[in-house]
Amino acid sequence: MTDGGVQVERVGDAPIITPASHPSIGTNIQGPSVIRAPAWLPDPLGRYLCYFADHKGSFIRLAYADAIEGPWTIHEPGSLHLADSGFLVEDLAIDAETLERITSRYRAALGDQLPVSLLDDLVTAHIASPDVHVDDDRREIVMYLHGLEALGDQRTRVAVSTDGIHFRATPETHGPSYFRCFRHDGWWYALAMPGRFFRSRDGRTGFEEGLTLFGPDMRHSAVRVVEGATGAELEVFWTRVGDAPERILRSRVSIAGPWERWCEIGEPVEVLCGAAPQSMVRLTSWPYEVELVAQRAA
């Protein structure tokens, strides 16, 4: 299918990774981020590396393949583990009064879109939602991931690796969950949930918050910078809280000029709907951050 600017092609008739792929990964498969292994990576497991998580898991999973279509093999030990992430490693306790107070605040903000797993979100120690990039200058793989920093406070950290398997977490936290990062005009930028933008000079320290676009129901996203008719644009593929079946939307953001003036271009367009068989889709080839892997977790 197309939306006038992007052609979407389904590849295969099943997800590339499922709970049947290996018992170590569990049944909740969340947040895949795929890179092409750079030439300088020593003894890569495969040409492509896929980092993903259980949304309340204790380590970042890792799969590898020599073709984007697969077959994909699970690297059973995974990559970064909770104990080495810098985040809380034990679940927190919460009393009924505090839970009700927090639930009321969420209900006032989100209405009937209140998360089903709100209690787990508030107290469960975990790491999830990796966003992985190749830093050729430093010859490092850079991972943005989130975890539980305090009661109800999920934050993003950076972890780095020289072999694509073993990661070292850095101490600083940078913002809320679901950082999706991109480079533009001498800065590293991050789009976090829901539609909040951050920036840093080096992409590893000192992220500052700027504008917010989209709406409060924006959830997961993937981003890339493209050249539009009037200058640089950010192409955003994203999902929306409450959509059933889940669908992937595409939005365009003008990022020409100061970020205070960034703005959405037109209305979001649906490019994929979960009503069809769930599988991998190829949108386009991006250097290192390759074809977007889209699968709907049950």
Question: Where are the model-predicted features located?
Answer:
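Carbohydrate-active catalytic/glycan-binding domains of CAZyme proteins
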Residues: M1-A298
